[in-house]
């Protein structure tokens, strides 16, 4: 069976991994079954209704992930693209870290840090991001006393990964190419 899996396209393997993870969660927590509906879209979702950027702004996204992430339309477009590839966990982690930095209450910060860790960092997390062991260790140490910078090292690694891998795929995608025509 494993030899057969190797022959499948990468997107099929990613989808299978996502289904396996969600089924595992479902078996552990049947009361949350409604949250685990697995949508399958042939085409990416349209971005949320925001002001469409100019062509010049959109062209800047090719060279700057930060400019893309700072633009609501660009962020929504990028997120839709990543969802269509079943690879949105890195962006979701980055966004969760941005929201986390804004928390003022130490109690809320500790609760949110635990949720982010359990959802994205720990081994076999539902949306585990691809970071090295050293970065995980630093993050775990930072979470002993949660602060706004607890996830900074991991967030920077994920940002670099998105810049190197996800952004070029987005720029080459039909989704972006149609947008800049």
From Swiss-Prot:
Which keywords belong to this entry?
Cytoplasm, Membrane, Signal transduction inhibitor
Top-level lineage group = Eukaryota
InterPro entries for the chain? RGS, RGS_RGS5, RGS_sf, RGS_subdom1/3, RGS_subdomain_2
Q: Name one Pfam family in it.
A: RGS
User: Cellular component terms, GO, for this chain's entry?
Assistant: cytosol; intracellular membrane-bounded organelle; membrane
Q: SMART domains given for it? A: RGS (SM00315)
Could you tell me which cysteines form disulfide bridges? none
Domain named RGS: which ranges? 64-180
Q: Where in the cell is it found?
A: Cytoplasm; Membrane
Question: Gene3D superfamilies attached here?
Answer: 1.10.196.10, Regulator of G-protein Signalling 4, domain 2
Q: Which GO terms describe its biological process?
A: negative regulation of signal transduction
Q: What role does this protein play? A: Inhibits signal transduction by increasing the GTPase activity of G protein alpha subunits thereby driving them into their inactive GDP-bound form. Binds to G(i)-alpha and G(o)-alpha, but not to G(s)-alpha.
The name this protein carries in UniProt is Regulator of G-protein signaling 5
Recorded source organism is Bos taurus (Bovine)
